[in-house]
């Protein structure tokens, strides 16, 4: 049958269960964990959506007709999985026929109690936030139209006053009318009893009275309906019940709490009790295993992993005398002597004293080498840390020197070495003023990134050489870029303020002239300039609103969709975390990497603590007295800085702000990686009907359905092949069926092919799928290959 071999060396299975195309980026170490995870995610999603689309009712499952119709509407063609930083970010793409139906089915998903509580809290928070934002947004709209608003408010206030004053009078009227109705009812009942026997006689005076009484009752009921409106009912009930409820609240709270406990406690079945016992046994076993592992680790008998090598830890030799004084922790300098003896002893060793002498020489040489290397490493790290601390202050001093000498003026005479035309602001001012604000914003962002890159390169040079000359071209170029960036920022801010001011003045003038309230007879007096200015102002407002604010607005527009999305993502996160804990031996390398990265971030923050946090000195002073107070103060400082950053627009952020935000983002990423929690993003893609019928997965499903309905396998294969070959896009088809076909005792394989199906070529665009049909006689395997032509190769240009 043949299998493709990927150019990078990994096999891409065509005849395997998972798809022929591979979308995960992976390294050598992380290949195994990504394969298992991707396969697990695909299986869970393929099983989950049919269950969600057909939830079981109380009486039993829904009828099969409706189930089949619903599944056909929402067929999943492909599930792509993309990875950015393995195993943290997972991007899932679901290609299906009817995506809306799949999204709506997520509401039937059952989640754990802890996750559900968190989701409910977030939903409540979002609803409260939406109400507050609506109030804020409606307030300025009301102030713009003052005249209409004042009239409406006066009317509403008058109505409220009347309702509050005349509430008691209306209630008294209602009581009197109800009493009259009760009297009339008693009178009518007696008259009806008398009139039952004498139906054939003429209407007496009593019966005439009864009719008049009924008419009166109708009129009274109509009056009551007018008086007793739903709003008045509510107000009356509120007024009467406030005093009663306040008195009873304290008494009822205790009773309700006791009742709730008894109400929600349900009796467990035998099966549930058995499960509980099993879980308890498992917990005991796990605790015992943990204790045993800890004891093994403490004794040094546990397996130890160093990089890619796994070795057993052997009892180590004691430390030499000269190393004990060097460090407080002597365990660091223990040497694996027994293992070295086995490796370095010669094959034909001499007897007695010669062997021991050889081992002693090896020991002494190793000890001296390790001692020297450790000292060198320590001094190198100290030197690097000192140079990193010196870099920024040294650069600031140089920049101040340049400004004092007049390098800021961008003269060619002054900047003979590092002069660059592109960073000359005075030459480009006239051209920049004409450009739109959006374009200028992008330019600022790009220049900032360029500045950061150059600064990092300079830092590396400074660490290696120890200093840099004041007349170097790189530093002068960086200084020129910095000045250009600062001036450009000021220019853009000035342009935005001018635009706002112009539009406000024009709007005020138009209100005075009455040009805003245009009618059919009066044409709109709006010039081209004002329309352009208003459009520009919209752009300015959109840029001023920061990115988190935009995200929040989108979320608040449709809370139900957001809740559904969060529910699905949290469910998948829980599934992946459970899978990772079960197969933790595959994630040992990623855990160690995340720990190393967190240490690096910690050291970086320690070095530049004065720059990142304004209250760093107070934290250091507190740390000497009490560690707990210093930790609390540090957390508060970090939270304050992050809050300020969130409020700031990206355009107004400094280099240090961007750096601090980046560090915080990296920290959260590596912490979640330690906890084996992934970051999942889901996208749904709708597939056209034409493209859907040409997918191998759907063709195989149709063959499986036909076989399960006891149709003849040869006819099914032939018809599917003919239907596919009618399409011009398809170049070749191959369908294979294997098992007890038509209930035969001996299993066999049958296959049909039309056109070309090259399985051995890498350039071939092949779509493959494998499904199993569960029949009465057993399982029948179905394989489908669809060839859609060759992919285009990048040909090298044949030039001179």
UniProtKB/Swiss-Prot annotation:
InterPro entries: KH_dom-like_a/b, KH_sf_prok-type, Ribosomal_S3_C_sf, Ribosomal_uS3_bac-typ, Ribosomal_uS3_C, Ribosomal_uS3_CS. The keyword DNA damage does not apply. Residues 665-800 are annotated as: S3-like 2nd part. The keyword Kinase does not apply. Residues 119-664 are annotated as: Intervening sequence (IVS). Residues 1-118 are annotated as: S3-like 1st part. Keywords: Chloroplast, Plastid, Ribonucleoprotein, Ribosomal protein. GO terms for biological process: translation. It comes from the Eukaryota. The large insertion sequence is present in the RNA transcript. This is Small ribosomal subunit protein uS3c. It comes from Chlamydomonas moewusii. The lineage of its organism: Eukaryota, Viridiplantae, Chlorophyta, core chlorophytes, Chlorophyceae.
């Amino acid at each position: 049958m043949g299998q493709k071999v990927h150019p990078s060396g990994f096999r891409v299975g065509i005849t395997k269960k998972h798809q022929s195309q591979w979308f995960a980026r992976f390294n050598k170490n992380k290949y195994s964990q990504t394969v298992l995870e991707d396969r697990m995610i695909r299986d869970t999603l393929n099983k989950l959506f049919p269950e969600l689309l057909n939830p079981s009712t109380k009486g039993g499952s829904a009828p099969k007709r409706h189930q089949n119709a619903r599944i056909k509407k929402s067929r999943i063609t492909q599930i792509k999985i993309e990875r950015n930083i393995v195993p943290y970010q997972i991007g899932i793409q679901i290609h299906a026929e009817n995506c809306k139906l799949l999204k709506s089915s997520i509401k039937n998903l059952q989640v754990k109690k802890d996750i559900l509580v968190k989701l409910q809290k977030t939903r409540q928070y979002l609803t409260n936030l939406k109400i507050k934002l609506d109030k804020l947004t409606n307030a300025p709209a009301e102030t713009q139209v003052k005249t209409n608003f004042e009239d409406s408010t006066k009317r509403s206030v008058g109505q409220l006053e009347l309702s509050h004053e005349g509430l008691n009078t209306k209630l008294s009227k209602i009581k009197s009318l109800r009493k009259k109705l009760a009297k009339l009812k008693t009178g009518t009942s007696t008259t009806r009893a008398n009139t039952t026997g004498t139906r054939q006689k003429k209407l007496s005076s009593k019966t005439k009275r009864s009719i008049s009484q009924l008419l009166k009752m109708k009129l009274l009921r109509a009056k009551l309906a007018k008086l007793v409106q739903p709003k008045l009912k509510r107000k009356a009930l509120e007024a009467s019940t406030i005093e009663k409820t306040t008195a009873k609240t304290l008494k009822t709270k205790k009773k309700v709490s006791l009742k709730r406990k008894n109400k929600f406690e349900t009796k467990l079945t035998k099966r549930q009790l058995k499960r509980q016992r099993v879980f308890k046994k498992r917990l005991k076993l796990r605790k015992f295993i943990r204790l045993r592992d800890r004891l093994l680790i403490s004794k040094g008998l546990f397996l130890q992993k160093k990089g890619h090598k796994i070795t057993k830890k052997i009892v180590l030799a004691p430390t030499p005398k000269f190393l004990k004084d060097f460090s407080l922790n002597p365990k660091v300098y223990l040497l694996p002597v027994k293992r070295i003896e086995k490796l370095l002893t010669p094959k034909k060793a001499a007897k007695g004293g010669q062997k021991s002498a050889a081992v002693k020489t090896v020991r002494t040489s190793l000890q001296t080498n390790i001692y020297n290397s450790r000292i060198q490493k320590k001094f190198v790290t100290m030197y690097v840390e000192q140079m990193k601390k010196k870099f920024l202050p040294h650069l600031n001093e140089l920049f101040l020197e340049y400004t004092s000498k007049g390098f800021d003026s961008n003269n060619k005479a002054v900047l003979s070495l590092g002069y660059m035309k592109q960073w000359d602001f005075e030459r480009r001012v006239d051209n920049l003023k004409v450009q739109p604000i959006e374009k200028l914003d992008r330019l600022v962002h790009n220049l900032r990134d360029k500045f950061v890159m150059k600064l990092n390169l300079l830092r590396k040079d400074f660490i290696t050489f120890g200093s840099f000359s004041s007349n170097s071209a790189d530093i002068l170029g960086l200084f020129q870029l910095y000045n250009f960036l600062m001036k450009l920022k000021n220019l853009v801010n000035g342009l935005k303020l001018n635009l706002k001011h112009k539009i406000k003045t024009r709007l005020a003038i138009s209100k005075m002239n009455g040009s805003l309230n245009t009618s059919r007879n009066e044409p709109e007096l709006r010039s081209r300039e004002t329309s352009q200015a208003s459009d520009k102002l919209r752009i300015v407002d959109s840029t001023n609103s920061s990115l988190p604010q935009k995200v929040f607005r989108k979320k608040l527009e449709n809370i139900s969709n957001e809740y559904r999305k969060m529910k699905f993502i949290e469910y998948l996160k829980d599934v992946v975390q459970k899978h990772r804990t079960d197969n933790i031996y595959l994630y040992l390398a990623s855990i160690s990497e995340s720990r190393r990265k967190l240490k690096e971030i910690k050291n970086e923050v320690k070095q530049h603590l004065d720059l990142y946090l304004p209250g760093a000195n107070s934290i250091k002073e507190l740390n000497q007295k009490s560690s707990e107070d210093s930790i609390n103060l540090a957390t508060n400082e970090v939270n304050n800085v992050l809050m300020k950053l969130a409020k700031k627009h990206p355009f107004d952020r400094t280099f240090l702000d961007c750096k601090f935000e980046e560090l915080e983002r990296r920290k959260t990423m590596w912490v979640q990686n330690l906890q084996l929690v992934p970051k999942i993003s889901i996208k749904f893609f709708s597939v056209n009907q034409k493209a859907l019928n040409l997918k191998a997965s759907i063709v195989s499903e149709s063959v499986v359905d036909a076989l399960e309905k006891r149709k003849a396998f040869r006819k099914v294969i032939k018809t599917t092949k003919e239907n596919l070959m009618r399409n011009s896009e398809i170049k070749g088809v191959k369908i294979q069926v294997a098992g007890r076909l038509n209930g035969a005792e001996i299993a066999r394989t049958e296959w049909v092919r039309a056109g070309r199906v090259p399985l051995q070529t890498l350039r071939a665009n092949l779509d493959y799928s494998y499904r199993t049909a569960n029949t009465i006689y057993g399982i029948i395997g179905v394989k489908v290959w669809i060839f859609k032509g060759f992919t285009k190769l990048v040909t090298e240009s044949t030039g001179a």
